[in-house]
């Protein structure tokens, strides 16, 4: 039996110090965690955050400051647990304040 790969990726977060929804996290189960890489880009294609840990959380910071409100894109590369198959997923994040 090959386990399903399950994703949940919130598309909005609000890093505004109100104690709610302060970080953005990519939730995934059923992958080979050693083959994981997640990158968040601004509208100019610059990398503003990346993680090799599926449980990593982005706090909305880039270069020591909170990013501007807006739409950011993400790309996740991951490996299936029971094969060498590599996959890519992409999406967007709305940063609100």
Q: What function would you assign to each model-found segment?
A:
Residues 1-97:
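Short loop/turn motifs at secondary-structure boundaries
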């Amino acid at each position: 039996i090959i386990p399903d790969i399950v994703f949940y990726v919130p598309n909005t977060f609000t890093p505004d110090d109100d104690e709610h929804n302060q970080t953005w996290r990519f939730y995934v189960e059923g992958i080979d965690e050693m083959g994981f890489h997640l990158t968040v880009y601004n509208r100019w294609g610059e990398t503003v955050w990346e993680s090799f840990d599926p449980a990593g959380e982005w706090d909305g910071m880039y270069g020591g400051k909170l990013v501007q409100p807006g739409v950011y894109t993400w790309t996740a590369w991951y490996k299936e647990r029971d094969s060498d198959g590599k996959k890519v997923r992409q999406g967007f994040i709305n940063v609100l304040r």
